[in-house]
Amino acid sequence: MNWLIAKGKAKAKSNVSLAIYRCVDGKPVISSDHLVKLNQLSSGEKQIVSIFSQIYLELDKKYIVLFDEPELSLSIYWQENLLPDILSSGNCMFLMAVTHSPFIFGNTLQNFTVGMHEFIKK
């Protein structure tokens, strides 16, 4: 990692920390007994932490986000909220997802969806 930092290929973010807390009635409870460690997260939850860390830690960047089947390893709740949450970050200038899940676009993005059948010529 130090080699990558020296070559300008990576940045050291030593002043960044991340805390994840469980929610009660939809609100995070900031206490040590509600703290969730990264190794306790599912693979889908780890993907979400990774995506949002990148989007929110690089404040001076705008992203083009492309997903192929973003629903993999995600609960229905996260399938419904992932794309709207990314767009609401203010750091996403373009978003495209290819999915089999009806939950990914079954939200405020419904009007922006296009089915593959619309491109099939008969």
Predicted segments, located by residue:
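Amphipathic alpha-helical domain-onset/packing element
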Residues: 1-13
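Switch/communication elements of ASCE P-loop NTPase nucleotide-binding domains
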Residues: 14-122
